Amino acid sequence: MPLTGLEIYKQLPKKNCGECGTPTCLAFAMNLASGKASLDSCPYVSDAAREALDAAAAPPIAKVVLGAGPTAVEMGDETELFRHDKRFYHETAIAIQVSDNLSSEELKAKVEAINGLNFDRVGQHYTIQAIAIRHDADDPAAFKAAVASVAAATQLNLVLMADDPDVLKEALAGVADRKPLLYAATGANYEAMTALAKENNCPLAVYGNGLEELAELVDKIVALGHKQLVLDPGARETSRAIADFTQIRRLAIKKRFRSFGYPIIALTTAANPLDEVLQAVNYVTKYASLVVLRTDAKEHLLPLLSWRQNLYTDPQVPIRVEEKLNEIGAVNENSPVYVTTNFSLTYYSVEGEIESTKIPSYLLSVDTDGLSVLTAYADGKFEAEKIAAVMKKVDLDNKVKRHRIIIPGAVAVLKGKLEDLTGWEVIVGPREASGIVAFARANLAS
């Protein structure tokens, strides 16, 4: 929890000098607590007090950056246990694992397939964020070659997975500027791993065999001066991993246990790709900031990415599209006009069905604060007056010759009033988007 004004006041010099712009230190403390002032405004605060206040004000889970440049991914910096309390902020990063045991041709083909993992769904663009290269070969040079090959073939972020710091060091030399995640520091190698991560300013995964060992290892690494950490509590069985992830998140959020105040990495282990995706869905749901999978099939990953997108939307703000007149196909002055709300799911469902009719059409989206048709109508946000006003706003009269507009069947009651307000012919369309194709064939086919 954030500090109160009185708790902050105890750390201040209590000089009441007024140089911060407020007459007393207590008033300044109250402003700090409410976010209206910065500690930098006080010239007399001690270094110890500043460190204590900065630590208290720090987010319960640190922000860790994977990668560099425009593709860099922010992990952590979360404040809630439950999405409905506020929201989750940084989407789980998805990484696809490749092995240095693959031949150069196999590796090239694998990376090419991973680069193609891009999806567009209901107006949202989905993609993965990283490729994880695992050192499985007996020859350390194979790992260096694999890392170099992957780095040259992709702009995705990198995760370098090797237990031997010397092997990692050789491979990292050519890609250090891309700030890959180094996996992983253990009780046996943490000093060398930490030195390598510090030297190259890279995030470091910390692997512990259980929560107690993990906490002790994190404290040792932080004492060595590196705080860009990602946690792996070691569990690979799904229910055990979920239990550990939940404990880490709960202790970080509720108890401010700093040893667990870092993002979590999860590795899937299921042999069957569908089971692997189910594992990943559970890990995304239960607090993993980075999930590493082996499957790279689009049909396996799309459900996972769709779930991630839904989980990380703001539950207090409906997903919506812009209020405007949208063109579907090569429209002309004879094209039919449909109208719907700007709720994203409704809009893209209608748009997809209109595209399936193969009839170039206009689709007018009306701003209903992101509510669906019936919900917006019940709330008074999708009424004849509102539709008429938007029609005038987009100058619809001059867009088409035949003044007729198709409204959703669920709000057929709007037909008469909308005709009176606009002078247009109002056609009552189907109640569901799935009926648009049959409706168009029956009513719009020339």
Curated annotation (Swiss-Prot):
Binds 1 [4Fe-4S] cluster. [4Fe-4S] cluster binds at C17, C20, C25, C42. Keywords: 4Fe-4S, Carbon dioxide fixation, Cobalt, Iron, Iron-sulfur, Metal-binding. InterPro entries: 4Fe-4S_dom, Ac-CoA_synth_d_su_TIM-brl, ACDS_complex_subunit, AcylCoA_decarb/synth_gsu, Dihydropteroate_synth-like_sf. Coiled coil: none annotated. Pfam families: CdhD (PF03599), FeS (PF04060). The keyword Transferase does not apply. One of its GO terms (molecular function) is iron ion binding. GO terms for biological process: acetyl-CoA catabolic process; carbon fixation. 5-methoxybenzimidazolylcob(I)amide binds at T340, T346, G370, L371, S372, V373, A433. Residues 2-59 form the 4Fe-4S domain. Transmembrane segments: none annotated. Gene3D superfamilies: 3.40.50.11600, Dihydropteroate synthase-like. Its cofactor is [4Fe-4S] cluster. It comes from the Bacteria. NCBIfam families: PRK04165.1. Acts as a methyl group carrier in the anaerobic acetyl-CoA pathway (Wood-Ljungdahl pathway) of carbon monoxide and carbon dioxide fixation. Binds the corrinoid 5-methoxybenzimidazolylcobamide which is then methylated by the AcsE subunit. Heterohexamer composed of 2 subunits of AcsC, 2 subunits of AcsD and 2 subunits of AcsE. This is Corrinoid/iron-sulfur protein large subunit. It comes from Moorella thermoacetica (Clostridium thermoaceticum). The gene is acsC.
